Amino acid sequence: MSKNDHLSDDELSLFREAVQGSKKLQQDTIIHQPSKNFSDLQQQRKSLKEGKNEEFFFSDEFVPLLSEDGPIRYARDDVSKYEVKRLRRGVYVPDVFLDMHGMKQDEAKRELGSMIAYCLKENISCASVMHGIGKHILKQKVPLWLAQHPDVMAFHQAPLEFGGAGAILVLLSIPDR
């Protein structure tokens, strides 16, 4: 029956007589969820992508070529050595500090990825990673992980005021938005 069809008075009274005494059923099995907004779906996809990118870049098998003489340092090919010198001197002041003391390698890798993702999201260009000295496990791994990330421009052992031999200052490239 379409909406344009009209019931006659006899048909309407016959229907009311037939359903007289019946109770309205309570619908309790199907839950109607509101349709999702397209922007909500885009936001969910973006957050999933960011979550995947937090740990994606760090491999334990890949070993980049880092200088073994002197304090730990690294600069991409397109980065001036002057930037590394500025990191060493403490010209760049870190806005974010990541303390890895007591973390296991997997946890440290995940936190490092989260810190880099946070810095990129908040447009923070300099961060400090405090790996500590301890058994030298994280002290050896953190530079290898940082050198693999495409947004890390350079890093250098931190000056004494930012942690000295137990920390690394990281310079990140912030994409133009």
Curated annotation (Swiss-Prot):
Signal peptide (UniProt feature, chain positions): none
GO BP field: rescue of stalled ribosome
PROSITE patterns assigned to the protein according to its UniProt record, in alphabetical order: SMR
Example GO molecular function: rRNA binding
EC numbers on record: 3.1.-.-
Residues in Smr domain copies: 98-173
Record flagged with keyword Hydrolase: yes
Entry's family note: Belongs to the SmrB family.
Family annotation (NCBIfam families): PRK04946.1 (NF003432)
Function description: Acts as a ribosome collision sensor. Detects stalled/collided disomes (pairs of ribosomes where the leading ribosome is stalled and a second ribosome has collided with it) and endonucleolytically cleaves mRNA at the 5' boundary of the stalled ribosome. Stalled/collided disomes form a new interface (primarily via the 30S subunits) that binds SmrB. Cleaved mRNA becomes available for tmRNA ligation, leading to ribosomal subunit dissociation and rescue of stalled ribosomes.
Protein's UniProt name: Ribosome rescue factor SmrB
Source organism: Aliivibrio fischeri (strain ATCC 700601 / ES114)
